[in-house]
């Protein structure tokens, strides 16, 4: 991993860490010498469901009774997110993809909300902003609560001169203004981990991903936008739109530098980050530093996974994979159990119950108005 380690003075947090719930006391009593994995135990499931968990970063494109039953059993609520990806045949057609997502939302018995998007590949078309806003507003009328800006802006799409189009391109500004005017949230996945711009490193958490998805591996490409350029463009969106709620997906793509995340959260009150698919980066930091960081920014960290499921796949296998991911994250955040990551053992953070409730539930409700059905 590259970047700096985030360090805090810990004196102010020890009292809060000492306030353990039953799931933490159980783990402390049992000890944590052996790494734990797999799906939830009955005790773990009881503790997990009690926080009313919300996964604010999921991609669901099936309407399967067994899958829906699993979501209910885990007492989960989801934000179902669409993107336009010209590299994936399943994600090229925004209208068709959205229909599949809405079908799941409508069948979820109020357990899913919808995050729409727009087609950035049309950015050079005449009337791009107006047609995108028209689509987005139609989705708002259907009940969408957020809009996704994806990493192909900054890492793939180019202008007529062959330059990478960045997130603060003027063509997008009317869209951001419209989202803010409707009191919706922008989910911004811009840039990727540092390893996308670095020489191959098998020790990186993302090594396998870039081997399988070379289109996003910027190292060695001619004249790519740097990660810093892309994130600075994101920051200009925050500055130009102070009333726009922005959730930076994947720790805001600042996963290697928790000091930088902290600076952004201090500087931009309209900015929060989700934890989706970046839990390994938390595990790689010193435990005490992560506890201090999370306690300080407990109102700005939102739980998400980036779990996905598509039609035509093995639903049962995916269900097991989903539950194992929720169980692994819960053990790391909520208990002092020992987990194994890349051949080494990692101790859970055993966060206080009130902090877990914020990360898993309260922050999602505040940063994504409408994520829960009005009847709750």
Where on the chain are the PLM-derived regions?
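Bacterial N-terminal signal peptides that target proteins for export
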Residues: 1-7
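C-terminal motif of bacterial Sec signal peptides marking the signal peptidase cleavage site
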Residues: 15-18
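An N-terminally biased module of ancient metal coordination in phosphate/nucleic-acid-related enzymes
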Residues: 22-111, 131
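H/E-rich (His + Asp/Glu) clusters that bind or coordinate divalent metals
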Residues: 36-37, 222, 227-236, 241-376
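Active-site gating/metal-coordination segments in enzymes
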Residues: 44-46, 95-218, 269-272, 279, ...
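Hydrophobic faces of well-ordered beta-strands that scaffold small-molecule active sites
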Residues: 54-58, 78-81, 112-116, 147-149, ...
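Acidic-and-aromatic substrate-binding clefts and catalytic sites of carbohydrate-active enzymes
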Residues: 57-65, 85-97, 121-130, 157, ...
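Conserved beta-strand->loop/alpha-helix structural units within folded catalytic cores of enzymes
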Residues: 58-60, 144-149, 169-190, 239-240, ...
């Amino acid at each position: 991993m590259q970047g700096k380690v985030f360090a805090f003075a810990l004196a102010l947090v020890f009292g809060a860490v000492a306030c353990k719930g039953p799931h933490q006391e159980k783990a402390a009593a049992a000890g944590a010498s052996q790494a734990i994995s797999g799906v939830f135990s009955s005790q773990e499931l009881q503790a997990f469901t009690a926080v009313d968990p919300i996964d604010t970063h999921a991609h669901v494109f099936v309407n399967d009774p067994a899958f829906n039953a699993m979501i209910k059993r885990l007492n989960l609520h989801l934000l179902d997110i669409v993107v336009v990806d010209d590299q994936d045949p399943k994600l090229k057609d925004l209208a068709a993809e959205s229909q599949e997502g809405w079908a799941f939302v409508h069948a979820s018995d109020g357990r899913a909300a919808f995050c729409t998007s727009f087609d950035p590949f049309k950015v050079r078309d005449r009337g791009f902003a107006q047609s995108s806003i028209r689509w987005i507003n139609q989705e708002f009328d259907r009940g969408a609560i957020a809009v996704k800006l994806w990493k192909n802006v900054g890492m793939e799409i180019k202008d007529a001169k062959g330059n990478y189009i960045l997130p603060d391109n003027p063509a997008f500004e009317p869209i951001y203004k419209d989202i803010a005017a409707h009191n919706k949230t922008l989910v911004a996945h811009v840039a990727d981990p540092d390893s996308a711009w670095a020489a191959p490193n098998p020790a990186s958490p993302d090594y396998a991903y870039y081997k399988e998805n070379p289109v996003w591996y910027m190292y060695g490409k001619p004249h790519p936008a740097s990660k810093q350029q892309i994130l600075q463009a994101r920051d200009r969106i925050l500055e130009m739109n102070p009333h726009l709620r922005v959730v930076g997906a994947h720790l805001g793509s600042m996963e290697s530098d928790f000091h930088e995340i902290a600076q952004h959260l201090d500087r931009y009150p309209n900015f929060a980050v989700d934890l989706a698919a970046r839990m390994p980066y938390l595990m790689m930091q010193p435990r005490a530093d992560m506890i201090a960081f999370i306690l300080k920014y407990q109102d700005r960290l939102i739980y998400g996974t980036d779990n996905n499921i598509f039609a035509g796949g093995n639903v049962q296998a995916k269900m097991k994979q989903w539950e194992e991911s929720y169980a692994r994250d819960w053990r790391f955040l909520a208990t002092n159990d020992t987990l194994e990551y890349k051949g080494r053992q990692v101790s859970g953070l055993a966060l206080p119950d009130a902090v877990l409730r914020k990360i898993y539930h309260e922050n999602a409700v505040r940063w994504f108005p409408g994520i829960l059905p009005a009847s709750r």
